[in-house]
A protein has these predicted regions:
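Acidic, polar-rich low-complexity tracts and alpha-helical solenoid repeat scaffolds
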Residues: 3-198
Length: 198
């Protein structure tokens, strides 16, 4: 029955039937195929990165369970490829969520979200872009802040800048972040002189 649902691309129903089969017939000769199909159901149900990634998380769990139970399966290379693809989808989703805040000018929220994306997925393929956006959002956030908060925010921006420059010294964004850092330093120098004159 589950094979018919699977072939008809009714992956929700197939996953339910396959899960039932796995629980009832765990010692069956067909269990490896059933568990592979079960994992693939979630893969096929997983949407693109712009949508909710709950199914992607379930797919990764099912695929990793399959790979740990059947490390010598004929399907293992296919599942490794799928695992990489789904992980990339989660990285893309985290990046897109953070970028949305940046795009609409919510720089404080963007900074938090971008840092969380890096913390959650430090190996993300978007790492350079995320770190650049942290610098840029921090710069914009500091520039648009009230005077009494600008000093601390420019200092935080310079910390992000130094981290970015250390990790990506050859980035296409280097000239731009250097310009932002120089502006921040100029502001801090002027502000320091004004404080000394008081």
């Amino acid at each position: 029955v589950y094979k018919r649902q699977y072939k008809n691309r009714d992956y929700d129903t197939a996953a339910t039937l396959l899960d039932d089969f796995r629980r009832k017939f765990g010692r069956s000769a067909f269990i490896e195929d059933a568990e592979g199909m079960y994992a693939l159901c979630f893969y096929y149900l997983s949407p693109g990165p712009s949508r909710d990634q709950t199914m992607t998380g379930q797919a990764l769990i099912a695929i990793n369970e399959f790979m740990s139970r059947y490390p010598h399966s004929e399907q293992i290379e296919n599942f490794k490829t799928i695992n990489t693809e789904l992980t990339q989808r989660l990285h893309d989703k985290a990046y897109l969520n953070a970028y949305t805040y940046y795009k609409i000018g919510r720089y404080k929220s963007a900074i938090v979200s971008l840092k969380n994306a890096l913390k959650q997925y430090p190996e993300s393929s978007h790492r350079e872009e995320i770190m650049y956006l942290i610098v840029d959002a921090s710069y914009r956030f500091a520039s648009n802040s009230v005077a009494e908060k600008q000093t601390d925010r420019y200092l935080a921006m310079l910390d992000s800048y130094l981290s970015f420059k250390e990790e990506f010294p050859e980035s296409k964004h280097i000239k731009e972040v250097d310009r932002m850092a120089q502006h921040a330093r100029d502001y801090l120098d002027r502000n320091k002189q004004e404080d000394n004159n008081i």
